[in-house]
């Protein structure tokens, strides 16, 4: 499974619709967790059926695509099954009891509810949330893959905007010929690693480099009045600085 990510661009009304879809996905997941807590013996199929009940009782839940509702129920069951596995294995300490999600930043669609343009430069979400057509910008080329190979589409919200992730079902084969050489690695804190040939790679310390900026940005947020626009702006800037440090670590 390959995951390709593109930056999405849309109007302000579309961004509001994306926020609404993400909140609805969070509501469905938390409702499934509550059902599992209240009714003993609730299984995965029961959570899938409960999605239809939520759609019938809540109009905003009915606006979300049916497969997107099922994907949210699968997220709830994933946390439940993880808790069951930890209990069966007898892991010491906390077992990871399913918790209600407070901050949700993504909504996942399966094979329906969206349509990719022929030029692969835009995607249209056609459920009742009103997201509509979003422009895509990225370095990956989706022309190499068929539409039926795209099994999941995620809308992910970050500090610097909205991203669209495509989960593509493809088998990767890499012909790797062994060289016959052996090497030893010593991973440390001062140096990132030192191999047996004497090569030393320094620790980049991305968090330490941007720590002063992060602390200063956090102080700016703390000094602002709660609920004010200035606090919202400072909070967004702080999120972008955190995202900048994370992206540097991933790109290295």
Placement of each model-derived feature along the sequence:
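Nucleic-acid substrate recognition interfaces
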Residues: 1-252
